[in-house]
Each structure stands twice: as C-alpha cells, then as structure tokens.
C-alpha cells in the first residue's frame, strides 16, 4: 500500500474508531448500527450453526474486528517496532477509550472484556500484517 493511500485509510479508520468510542449513546442503540445488529442477530438465530451467537457474542466479535485494522496500520507505519510494543498500543488505545466512557459517557458500558477483545483484535491485525510482509519478502 502506498503511504498516501495508507494515510488516507488510516485517517478514515481513526474517524470511525474515535466516533465509535466516544459516541454518547451505545453505538448499536439507534440508527443504522442498531438495524445491522438486529439483522445480524436475526440471521444468527435462523442459522443452526450460528444460533449460539447472541448479543454478547456479537458485541465481542465487533470489538475484536474494530481493532484489527489498528494492528495492521501499526505494522504498516512502524514495521521495525518490536511486537510487544506494537501489541501494547491497542491495549492503551482501548484503555483510553473505555476510560473516557467511564468518566464522560454515563450511557456507555465500559468493561474489561471490551479491552481484552480490542487488544485481541489489535494483535490479530499485527499478526496478519506481519504474515503478509513475511510472505512478500520471501516471494522476492
């Protein structure tokens, strides 16, 4: 990915991440995300292999997926940074987001599980990006 395009993608992602994190009401409580959430839950309820997915599982999956791009962007913009340092960034970003919700957004629900799921998503993103970089390097 060329750097200007990567910067644009990063900016778009950060807008989504910040908006999702500091929206005053639960992001799935109203609007398009509530419709998507309801439709996904209806779909999982009608699909025998997915009927175990309830709201809490869907929220956890969403938290993981939300932070996967962060891990990817960390590797794109800081490829030589040690993995442990990279992995700490999603944890710190999530702690900042969840802490802000606790302090300033009384209608939001911040939990340790959110931090864990967000961190997991970041680590998955780091793993994906590092794996792709390794494959590209080995193919040359």
Predicted features, each with a name:
Residues 1-108, 112, 126-140:
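Bulky hydrophobic segments
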């Amino acid at each position: 990915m060329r750097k200007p395009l990567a910067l644009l993608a990063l900016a778009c992602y950060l807008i989504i991440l910040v908006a999702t994190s500091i929206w005053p009401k639960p992001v799935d409580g109203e609007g398009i995300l509530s419709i998507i959430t309801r439709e996904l839950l209806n779909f999982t309820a009608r699909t025998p292999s997915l009927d175990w997915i309830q709201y809490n599982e869907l929220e956890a999956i969403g938290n993981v997926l939300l932070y996967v791009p962060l891990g990817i962007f960390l590797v794109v913009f800081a490829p030589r940074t040690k993995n442990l340092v990279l992995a700490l960034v999603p944890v710190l970003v999530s702690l900042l987001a969840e802490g802000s919700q606790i302090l300033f957004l009384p209608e939001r629900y911040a939990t340790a599980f959110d931090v864990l799921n967000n961190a997991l998503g970041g680590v998955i993103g780091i793993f994906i990006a590092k794996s792709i970089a390794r494959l590209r390097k080995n193919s040359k």
